[in-house]
Amino acid sequence: MQREYDYIIIGAGSAGNVLAARLTEDPGVSVLLLEAGGPDYRLDFRTQMPAALAFPLQGRRYNWAYETEPEPHMDNRRMECGRGKGLGGSSLINGMCYIRGNALDFDHWAKRPGLEDWGYRDVLPYFRKAETRDIGANDYHGGEGPVSVATPKNDNNVLFQAMVDAGVQAGYPRTDDLNGYQQEGFGPMDRTVTPQGRRASTARGYLDMAKPRDSLHIVTHATTDRILFAGKRAVGVHYLVGNSSEGIDAHARREVLVCAGAIASPQLLQRSGVGAPDLLRALDVQLVHDLPGVGQNLQDHLEVYMQYACTKPVSLYPALQWWNQPAIGAEWLFAGTGTGASNQFEAGGFIRTREEFDWPNIQYHFLPVAINYNGSNAVKEHGFQAHVGSMRTPSRGRVHARSRDPRQHPSILFNYQSTDQDWQEFRDAIRITREIIAQPALDPYRGREISPSADCKTDAELDAFVRARAETAYHPSCSCAMGTDDMAVVDGQGRVHGMEGLRVIDASIMPRIITGNLNATTIMIAEKIVDRIRGRAPLPRSTADYYVAGDAPVRR
């Protein structure tokens, strides 16, 4: 087997697959793509059927199933931190919500020294390059990219439109495209689903395009033990296949590209000798480079589920009954349509809770059934729910490798809800949600409040509910942040500071978490940086307009 390549990519996820496909477009460029998980089996409904999105989170085949340390502000709960394992990474198990973030997220990135070319108009062309939207291209959307994006259709569940209308009746804006001119407001939510009703992971979009090339070598069940260095230059990797303890060395002529995600990328750097000296000393790892920001600045989105009974039999509750599932599965399998072909997050919104926020600080996902995201605790009646959570928490956490063993999970602490702002935002969010649900648009459907329940009212009661019941939105990020400050890990091209031939390219390099789901932005980051790796000129900046709230009131 060939053991020398131009590039070695660690992690076949949302970013790694983009790099593998784009780098091998160039003749004569060889790539080794290492993935610790297995293939993305196309006949496994658990990952391929959009409506089955809870299933991969319940097992270990496709999910690393990390857990946090006891979270001190969350009743010391050990909280889930699911991450994708297998070709596609977290795009193989995520909720398929296609949300890019707010334009001002990127404009604020670009205000940081060294990140001047990460403004919204710089990144929008790369969002478009990656996308094929089912209703065609425009100034904001692409029509020729590897990622299939489906838009909600008029014949979907009546509760979606009712919830959007209720948000507008409560005084918030309506938007026809959460990824278009104006993110702020309520409207339909796009999803990464193919025209055939299948999950559009990066394995399907990018790897399918690249697999026929002889220059791409993919190894699954390959756990990267450590990066190999000659001085300060990354020259290869040492990896293990399956349960073997016998490692394999592979050498990179040009670069090693770390795309293992916001949990595993910093863990790998630390195990390889790049990180804070005190931590490496405790792990008995020889210091290659002192970089204290590795694993710091960890951020996530937290959310609560506001659940309501539905007084009409229009929710998806019947789809949870086993006797209805064969028909749903058959329609999806043979026609690619029906309940199974949607992730059921077809409406949502972004709002500002207070005038002090320049762009939305709260996100909504609407779901026409009352159930936990991971499929647990389904309410045994017709119901619906709003997932609501804050977007740019000031709380910061960290990821630390526990040992040199690549198969041991790292120590993860998000430090959720560690600031006063966190608590104020969740109190506001719960109270605003109740105002929205009380609007006339939901009069035909609204039953009692199931969770947290109508008698949960005071600040103390709401805080107790958040501590006991809030869950991750599965958006870990920022643990190898881009920038030039002392705690930055990479520059604006993903190059690890102080090193040669080594980049990190995934959600970990976001300097600050974005307003929304992370998958689309992670793909964009990879598309943008791979142009630089290939020596290509950046795509021309967009000239598209975008909404800035300015002095506009939070609600009418």
Curated annotation (Swiss-Prot):
Annotated keywords: FAD, Flavoprotein, NAD, Oxidoreductase
Cofactor dependency: FAD
Active site (catalytic residues): H475
GO biological process, one term: glycine betaine biosynthetic process from choline
Gene Ontology cellular-component annotations: membrane
Pfam families referenced in this protein's UniProt entry, alphabetically: GMC_oxred_C, GMC_oxred_N
Reactions this protein catalyses: choline + A = betaine aldehyde + AH2; betaine aldehyde + NAD(+) + H2O = glycine betaine + NADH + 2 H(+)
Binding site for FAD: 6-35
Pathway: Amine and polyamine biosynthesis; betaine biosynthesis via choline pathway; betaine aldehyde from choline (cytochrome c reductase route): step 1/1
Top EC group: oxidoreductase
Its EC number(s): 1.1.99.1, 1.2.1.8
GO-annotated molecular function: betaine-aldehyde dehydrogenase (NAD+) activity; choline dehydrogenase activity; flavin adenine dinucleotide binding
Function in brief: Involved in the biosynthesis of the osmoprotectant glycine betaine. Catalyzes the oxidation of choline to betaine aldehyde and betaine aldehyde to glycine betaine at the same rate.
Matching PANTHER family: CHOLINE DEHYDROGENASE, MITOCHONDRIAL, GLUCOSE-METHANOL-CHOLINE GMC OXIDOREDUCTASE
Family indicated by similarity: Belongs to the GMC oxidoreductase family.
Name of the featured protein: Oxygen-dependent choline dehydrogenase
Organismal lineage: Bacteria, Pseudomonadati, Pseudomonadota, Gammaproteobacteria, Lysobacterales
Gene: betA
